[in-house]
């Protein structure tokens, strides 16, 4: 299915962007499906894409030397996967593996960065929204650490 500005307007992360901004993002996007168990990306890999999750769940993990990956969180419906597209050195900070079958909108990161450079308002909006996601995840991690220390 083709990704359109109407498709993107319904995404929580992109709600409120102008139609021309949504059109610019739609030109960089496609719909993808991943089966349960599929590793979307590995920690430290070069960033090529980021995703908005339409259905399913993705586990975020970190590699611990000599151990299995440790799951540090999940991203579900409406969530953003792959915030590292915005920050140098453009490497994924965590790994991501599908817990269930996942349907998502995939954005080509270099093309989105080009559009942000051409439209600073779009760049500001996406950066602000990205930092909201990061702040929410940091708060969630903090809560889990506090709960563990009290257990």
Regions found by a protein language model. Give the residues of each.
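Cytosolic regulatory regions built on CNB/CRP/Popeye-like sensor folds
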Residues: 1-151
